Amino acid sequence: MTVVDAGFDSATAPLRAELLAHCYRMSGSASDAEDLVQETYLRAWKAFHRFEGRSSVRTWMYSIATNVCLTAATARRVLPVGLGGEPSNPLEPVVPSTEVLWLQPLPDRALGDPGEAAVAREGIGLAMVAALQVLPAKQRAALILRDVLEFSAAETAAALETSVASANSALQRARASIGDGAAQEGRRAAELSDHEKQVWDEFCAAFERHDIDGVVRILAADATWEMPPIPGWYRGAEAIGELSRTQCPAQVAGDLRMVPTVCNGLPAAAMYLRSPAADGAGGDVWLPFQLDVLTFTDGELTHVSAFLDPADLFALAGLPAELR
């Protein structure tokens, strides 16, 4: 390692977690955010010998990351409830949609030690990130830089490679568009009451017992449930119970195993589904099936975002690829 390489690593490595969060806010995708951070570090390393210290290394890295995200910007990512349709019938077949870019959760484990880089954990709630995706990419960047990261108007303009007046205009339009779009964010896992923690535990236990009636009792009466990449969503504890009875491949107690985790700062549960072992070892193996992110409002479990086909997300969360 050269002196320049060592200097680059010592100056930029501590910023990785917050840059990952920034790229996630911009992209709405945990897996894309990883790629965007890698591209950010590659560009920064190539340009480090030209860095003159006119701004802090942190501001410089955010400028690079922001422009990487703007260059890579695609169609906005959404959750099923954000598509604007009516609640679905739980008795109708569920069919995944590959025509929509779906929002992904971000496992907290990907952000490293909870005691470090607190800024990485600001503004990453699912409702907030979903609301951000509604904005044009440049407005999204302006809002994140000013209102989440608390950059100055001049720093924001520099990161966006535009004038202060233009950056302020983008910020004003973003604030007007987003309104209270993130107002229904749930309680963070670290702030749950004892009652809410108990409901979280009971949610996991009920699915492991295949106790659908128990799941219904745990949910708020008007709870909502979504399962990207399934485009439909469901309203009401009874409807959600019917969905679980008729559509879930688990049939008996023990088919599912649940591992509590945290995503986007919110309580979550990694769901593993029993499958015959394919390695000739005999017995059963439980494989990643679903990642449930829970929203608690006023002490009740009011919403579940259940992400299907979550193997990559399990890896980001530091969860095992299988259970035996």
Predicted segments with their positions:
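A short pre-motif secondary-structure segment
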Residues: 142-143
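Low-complexity, glycine/alanine/valine/leucine- and proline-rich hydrophobic stretches
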Residues: 241-324
